[in-house]
């Protein structure tokens, strides 16, 4: 079990949360999800995800530090690799890199994901980053990215030559890519047991395609909204708006969504949210989130 925060929290708060997570024994890591400036509509200000990770790293000593996720559509793999290497050095080898499409973040950018298909984009990004981590000389020219670099002896300098890369995977093609090439798979918000089973099955198919045998403890992580309070009603309220935001996100950005289907709720349950999207009121949907939806998607103590 780990802890995840978005990078719209203040850096001092992030450091306090990271220390508390480490002291509480969360062995699954302290993770940062990249926030974007559209969170201002909720009164929140985005910070740079790597700077936020650095703040968490400086406040801790042993807990794994992870990024879940940043998008290869937003940063060239060479830039991603440089940022990874810096955080990994700062953390003494505790860093885990996570990459994923991040549709919410790139919807304001002029990327055509129908032409720049996510699977090859992420494949090429991992290829380049791993070659940079290795320190070996290389020249790479892919369909979307290219890079060439002279050698550098990272190992002698005490730097890791293999930094784990996890893939954020919502759909079956990205889940198969995770099985073929990644060091771990990250699932999106509103993860449910049924969706985990679905994703792991696709991941295994991808591994089989590559002739790869995944260990039983191959990392698979999912984002689960959680709130703790002595007052159960207050805990429900704390997660209700976020649950609504995630539901809208899935309906807007993912075709043939399997996350919502995995909840076991009928498809008609999401019709009020679809109407809100059509009406332009998708930012005010907390009241549409039922107790049953929260039971399927969240962990509430109180």
What are the language-model segments listed below?
Residues 1-5, 28-32, 64-68, 95-99, ...:
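Hydrophobic faces of well-ordered beta-strands that scaffold small-molecule active sites
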Residues 1-66, 163:
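N-terminal beta1-alpha1-beta2 module of alpha/beta enzyme domains
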Residues 1-12, 68-78, 159-170, 226-227, ...:
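Active-site mouth loops of central-metabolism enzymes
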Residues 10-21, 80-83, 169-177, 239, ...:
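Short, acidic/polar
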Residues 15-19, 50-57, 81-85, 119-130, ...:
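Generic structural signal for well-ordered alpha-helices
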Residues 19-23, 53-62, 84-94, 179, ...:
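Acidic (Asp/Glu)-rich catalytic clusters
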Residues 116-156, 196-302:
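An alpha-helical appendage that flanks or caps ligand/catalytic pockets
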Residues 166-168, 175-176, 181-185, 189-196:
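Ligand/cofactor pocket segment of small-molecule handling proteins
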